[in-house]
Amino acid sequence: MVRLAVIGANAPLILFYRRAKALGYYVIGIAWAEGAVCKQYCDKFYPISFKEKDEVLRVCREEKIDGITSFSLESALPTVVYVAQAMGLVSNTEECIRLTETKFAQRQTFEKNGIPTPEYHLIQSKEELNDMSANYPVIVKPVDSGGSQGITKVEVPEGIEAAYSVAVECSRSGRVIVEEFIDGREFSVEALSHNGKHYILQITDKVTSGAPHFIEMQHHQPADITLEQANCIKETVEKALTALKIENSPSHTEIKLNSRGELYIIEIGARMGGDYISSDLVRLSTGYDMVKGAIELATGRFAIPCIQESHYAGVYFYSSLAPRIGNVIRDHAKHPEIVEYEIDDAPLVEAKSNADRNGYFLYQSDNGKMVL
């Protein structure tokens, strides 16, 4: 049986753990004990912080693992690469970690390689904030957090200090990046990279709440774009993945396309996409199991992806921003397109990040995007 080590075991990883077990892998979970809800899907579980790299490496050597991953947990990627490199397993390199670990590092790399990216300022103190010269509106965000945490759109200079304070609270390093605001449509791109060759699997339409926090509310595949736009997106993303040295891993790229047709890379994670995009939507829309592909990649059993199906698929999230989704979920029997759902009938809380949700449903259709 192929032995797979998974770093991290919190709730967002449950879908990936379930799939790994369903595929017949021997799963070894390594994570903090607190919040390790994925423990039930492990053949073995070690309550070790992924920050203890040498201890994680010791366990992985003892377990004679065939591959290691953190699925969509970006903060664990340095440990994944550390262990894989020490054991001669498939992974990205330490240089890739250095280039991708912060939004600022990515901006610098894109700029150096002629890849379209918003103008930006790294802010490490209030003094630097006060000295900054920027064209408004801007986006203020932590350099090193995800899930829409700490992100604020600022229209005028008078709002910059409050947005900075919010971003600093969510930043592990206390650093903030202030970026040019790019108005336009949002997309994500899911890909697998093997030995430096990139395989684009799907392009996703993203619907957010907009300003001020840009919370993700819906995702739909395939994106409603022209063939020319799709080719431009694929070409730009492949160039960006190469620049960031993403050579042996899944990736999740966020991009924006403005009204003039100009494409900008917002950020790239050298990991699976969350929000059911990689775990479910790619499979529902293309027939290709991205989780299976990512595990095969990590364990040295990669096969070139073969896309043989074409369907429409998507996810709607139930939150204070979209309360009517709760009624759709409750009446799911009236909607044959719905293939999976979950609902929590606790009172809705004010949505300030992607974590503030009370449910979701997934759909698959051969008759176009499911419109409510």
What spans do the regions from the language model cover?
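ATP-dependent carboxylate/phosphate-activation module, predominantly the ATP-grasp catalytic core
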Residues: 158, 180-246, 250, 257, ...
